[in-house]
Regions:
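N-terminal nucleophile
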Residues: 1-107
Length: 107
């Protein structure tokens, strides 16, 4: 479903979620990240706010969602309710992807 698991708008950036898709659909999680950036939040804050939206559902499966995002300048970030989550990224200047630890936010 567009806007829940993945969303992109070249004016602001892109976001994707992994985990329990039914929960991401309820809040259009990926689209929410982009909307928060449109409203003036930087990527890290937009990802955090989208995770707060999920937390406010009080759904036990919301803790399984992980978010990654990219702003229009190419800066990336990953946020999750679960400790020790990682994501990988690669730019056109790289020959191999790099794995990065996501930032953990308590659920």
């Amino acid at each position: 479903m567009i806007g829940a698991g993945g969303y992109a708008d070249n004016r602001w950036g892109a976001a994707a979620s992994t985990g329990t898709g039914e929960v991401a659909i309820r809040t259009s999680t990926a689209r929410s990240v982009i909307l928060y950036m449109k409203m003036g939040l930087a990527l890290p804050e937009a990802l955090q706010e989208a995770l707060r939206d999920l937390r406010d559902l009080r759904d036990p499966y919301a803790e399984y969602i992980a978010l990654i995002g990219l702003d229009r300048e190419g800066r990336h970030a990953g946020y999750t309710h679960r400790p020790n989550e990682r994501y990988a990224y690669m730019t056109d200047a790289m020959t191999e992807p790099e794995e990065v630890k996501s930032i953990h936010i308590s659920h």
